[in-house]
Structures are given as C-alpha cells and as structure tokens.
Amino acid sequence: MPATPLKSALQIHRINNTNTATNMISHCHKQPQTATSNGGATLHRRITACCPVSAPETVGRHHTHTVGSNQCSSAVVQHIAAPVSTVWSVVRRFDNPQAYKHFLKSCHVIVGNGDVGTLREVQVVSGLPAATSTERLEILDDERHILSFSVVGGDHRLANYRSVTTLHPSSNGSGTMVVESYVVDVPSGNTKEDTCMFVDTIVRCNLQSLAQIAENLARSNRSSSLA
C-alpha cells in the first residue's frame, strides 16, 4: 500500500552548507543550501534566500505542497528593488517566460489566450537535460499576484513539476519579495537532494534575472515620469 503523501509547509531558514550543483551555471550567483526534515520524514523543503527577508504570514498558505514519497519540494526567495506592479507585469506573461527565464529559447502558446488552462510549449537552451516542456497555467491571480503552472509533457526529466510564484510588498515598502516554490518527481537514478539542488539553481537564476529586468524597468518608468 503506497504511503500517504506528506504536506510540506513553508519554512524559511538560513542555509549553512554548499553543493557543487551550482557550478553547472557559471553566471548564476552561488547560494549555500541544506535540507530539512519533519517528524523523521524527509520533505526536502528548503528555502534559498537571495537576501535577508521577512516573509508575510500568508506566504505559507500558497506554498504548501503535497509531497509524494518519490518527490522533493523547495522554494527560493528573491528581493527586488521595484514595485510589485512592475515585477508582476513581467511575471504574469505566461506567453513570454523567456523574457526573464534565460534557459528558455522560445515559447509557443498551444491552447488558450492567457487564461487559466492555457497550454504553452517552451524550447530549452542547449546544455540542460531537456529539450522541450509543455506547461499548463493553473493559477493567474492579478489581485493577489499569484501565478502557478504545471508541466504536463515534453522532453525533459522533471515529471509532475508544479510551480507557484507569489509577489509581496517588501516590509520596508521599497520593493517586492518574490517567492517561488515547486514540487517535482525525483528522476530515476537521482536523489531528492540532487534534484532539489538542480532545480533550486535554475529557479534562483531565473529570479535573479527577473530582479535585474524589473529594476531596470522601474528605473526607466521613473525617468519617463520625470521627463
């Protein structure tokens, strides 16, 4: 009889050891990482904080995933010195993820017009263990700034991948805190730790790219308003 899937709740903590998985992507800043456990059951629920953060209490509600026995789950937090509205204008474009996800070459919408249920096919850059990914938009909440998608097909090794991204005003009111969490099957021949290290690296690079783009956009908007 299969074990009952466990629910992994958001736990933000400082990470204290390193892993060579981050070396695979030279332009992404390295971040120390670790894994946590709950009641003896390994959840591999980690938070990689790209800077010191104070997460709103509501964050955990959106980033609690049911984690199967052969799955891992993790999250990355990124502070961005730009308003939520500016960051959201980039994140919400389900039809244009390559705008800040530089490991994607292109995106083609297969079904839908950007509403929940829309399907997209993305082409992955060479050098990663993937070629294409077919993804379904699960949540697009413009009021609460939540986007979620799931991987439903393609040529890759990340089966049953589901991601949730939320945006929150920074506690000091000067920017945005982005939290992106995921749950994914552990590929055959890999460990939960290795899988989370790999995906964390990709997500972290994406969010660092998002920060650069949104901050540049915010500066441009400020300059235009003063002109």
Language-model-detected regions and their locations in the chain:
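Glycine-rich portal/gate segments that line the openings of hydrophobic small-molecule binding cavities
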Residues: 2, 79, 85, 92-159, ...
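Hydrophobic ligand-binding cavity/cleft-lining segments
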Residues: 2-115
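Beta-strand/loop substructures that line and gate deep hydrophobic ligand-binding cavities in soluble
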Residues: 2-5, 150-205
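A general secondary-structure signal for short beta-strands and their flanking turns/coil
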Residues: 69-73, 117, 130, 160, ...
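Eukaryote-biased feature marking scaffold/signaling PDZ-domain proteins and nuclear chromatin regulators
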Residues: 71-73, 82, 144, 162, ...
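Structural signal for hydrophobic/aromatic residues that build the beta-strand cores
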Residues: 87, 91, 120-122, 137, ...
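Short amphipathic alpha-helical segments embedded in low-complexity Lys/Glu-rich regions
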Residues: 104-109, 195-196, 226
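Short, highly charged C-terminal tails/helix-capping segments
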Residues: 208-227
